[in-house]
Each structure stands twice: as C-alpha cells, then as structure tokens.
Amino acid sequence: MSNLKQLRTRIKSVKSTQKITKAMQLVSASKMAKIKSQIANSNFYIEAVSKMMSAILSIDMYELSIEEQKFFNTVPNKANLLIVMTSQRGLCGTFNYSIIQQVKNDIKELENKGEQIKLIIIGKKGYEALKRQYVNYIDSYFELPKIHDENLMLQVKQKIMSAVENLEVSNCVIYFNKFKNAMTQIMTRQQILPVAKYQDDSMIDNPIVNLVGFGYKERGAKPINNRSATSDIVGESKSIDYNYEYEGENLISNLINLYVNSQINYALLQSRASEEGARMTAMENATNNANDLISKLVLKLNRSRQAIITTELIEIIAGSEAV
C-alpha cells in the first residue's frame, strides 16, 4: 500500500509541474507574439537608417568632422568592444549556450592575436557564465528588464558612444540570437562600428534622392517642408512620416545616434523574441514529457493495484479451499 501512496503522490506532483510548464508556455507564446509585432513595426525604420549611414561612406557631398570620422574608421591598437545579449532567466533551452560559446571562441582568438578586449554584457545568464573567466574584460553589466525598456537601450548606446568618442575601442560587435521561428534561433554576430560601406549601386548612384526622402538635401540645408516622402532605400516605395528637429548641419551626428540606437533596439527585440520562442518550445517539450510520465505512472499504479487485488483474491480462494 505504501508503494501505491508513493505513486499517487508522484503523479500529483508531476501534474502540478505540468500545469506550471503549460502556463509558462502560454505566457511565452503571448510575449513572443507581442515582440514579433514590435519587430515588424520597426524593421523598415532600422533598415532605412542602416542603409543611409552606409551610403554616406559612398558619396562625397558630406565632409565628416573629426568627431564623426571616429564612427566610420577603425582606430588601431585599441580594444575590441563585444556586446553580449543573453537572457535574465533560464528555462529557455540552448538559447544562452550558443551565444556564450561563440563569445568565448572569439575572445580566445583575439587573445591569441594579442588584442585588447572590452565586454558589455546584457542579461544575468551571460554575466554569470563569463564573469569568472573574463572578469577583467567586463566593462559594464546590465540586467534585462521584464519588458522592452528604452532606458536600457539608451544606457548601452551611451556606453558605446563614449567609448568611440574617447578613442577607447577600434570596433564594436554585438552578439545576439536572431529570431526565425519559435523553434529556430540563429546566433548572430553583427558589427555596429565602424559603419560598413553599403554596396547597393542604386543607392550610391542617386544618394540625394534617397536622403531627400528623409527631409534633407545636403549638409547645411534646411529640412524640406513636406511631412511625408517616398524612399527607395529598401528597394520598394514606402511612405515615411517624420518630424523635423535638427538643422542639416547636424545631420551626420544625429544619424549616428539614430543608427546606434536602431542597431541596439533591433538586437534587443530579436534577442527577446528568440528567448521567448526558445522558452515556449522548452516548456512545450516539458509539458509533453510530463504527460508521458503521468501516463507511465498511472499504468504502473494500475498494475500495482491489480497485482494487490489478484494476490488478495488468491489468498481468499486458498483460504476457502482449506476450510
């Protein structure tokens, strides 16, 4: 009987765990859907800013100031700034493992070359995995808030901008998981700075038309009066709605800020969507495994009960025959 009690207790415990994993699966699915919507809404803006920045390198109409040149040129003999985006919580499968392993491999390669390294880590899991071995490389650590927070993006951007402006780093690379679907996340290593030259000939051939779509004609020019324009930056016609805040003289500086902001925002959104997708898949697998385990335990319980009943019947029959 004690064996039956243990089986019932275990079944009850597994069912309780199954309810938790199922709830976590549904919560992650809801969060993932919301973040996917945010990604869809921001994709065009992020791509447009990136291509505008890259196109500046291909045209001669803009004379970059000394401060602006720091964001477009590699500074020799300075540190490599690695930004690592991981999760704040666990229970998300191999989401963090692929990022951490890639970072460790790259750090080892940079160490072999004798290069300097700086780390900015976002997310508790990445910090815990890297702090013991690379504590001397860690420049900053940020905890990941429960919801997408612009303050985090601004803090990370400020760290990057400060490091570049003070000539502390030669380049900036960001590591994050790119969302493909709930079951697939792609480990991505993307260079933010220096800004890479854009290779699309259509953009280079007619840069003024594309930049006019964003409200400027050339350095020093005033913003155009109309509030919407058609841009061909991403290869298709789309209406862009915008507000004017800056004179053309500050165009490059403000574009640099927009560019760094957009890259960090893109990586954060992709990482969050990937995390929730990985957690949803992990919890779905856990729920299914719990269901299989419950079925096996119930079968074992029924067999044990049947064995006890059979034994008792045999004893009763044997006793009656003896009488």
From Swiss-Prot:
Principal localisation: membrane
Compartments in which it is found: Cell inner membrane
Name of a matching Pfam family: ATP-synt
The protein's role, per its UniProt record: Produces ATP from ADP in the presence of a proton gradient across the membrane. The gamma chain is believed to be important in regulating ATPase activity and the flow of protons through the CF(0) complex.
One Gene Ontology term, aspect cellular component: proton-transporting ATP synthase complex
Family statement drawn from the similarity comment of this UniProt entry: Belongs to the ATPase gamma chain family.
Organism of origin: Rickettsia rickettsii (strain Sheila Smith)
Keywords (A to Z) from UniProt: ATP synthesis, Cell inner membrane, Cell membrane, CF(1), Hydrogen ion transport, Ion transport, Membrane, Transport
GO molecular function, one term: ATP binding
Membrane-topology descriptor: Peripheral membrane protein
CDD domains: F1-ATPase_gamma
Lineage: Bacteria, Pseudomonadati, Pseudomonadota, Alphaproteobacteria, Rickettsiales
The keyword Coiled coil is assigned to this record: no
Source taxon at top rank: Bacteria
Gene3D superfamilies assigned to the protein according to its UniProt record, in alphabetical order: 3.40.1380.10, ATP synthase, gamma subunit, helix hairpin domain
Record keyword Membrane present: yes
Entries under InterPro entries matching the protein: ATP_synth_F1_ATPase_gsu, ATP_synth_F1_gsu, RPE2
Protein name, entry field: ATP synthase gamma chain
Family matches, as HAMAP family: ATP_synth_gamma_bact (MF_00815)
Quaternary assembly: F-type ATPases have 2 components, CF(1) - the catalytic core - and CF(0) - the membrane proton channel. CF(1) has five subunits: alpha(3), beta(3), gamma(1), delta(1), epsilon(1). CF(0) has three main subunits: a, b and c.
One GO BP annotation of this record: proton motive force-driven plasma membrane ATP synthesis
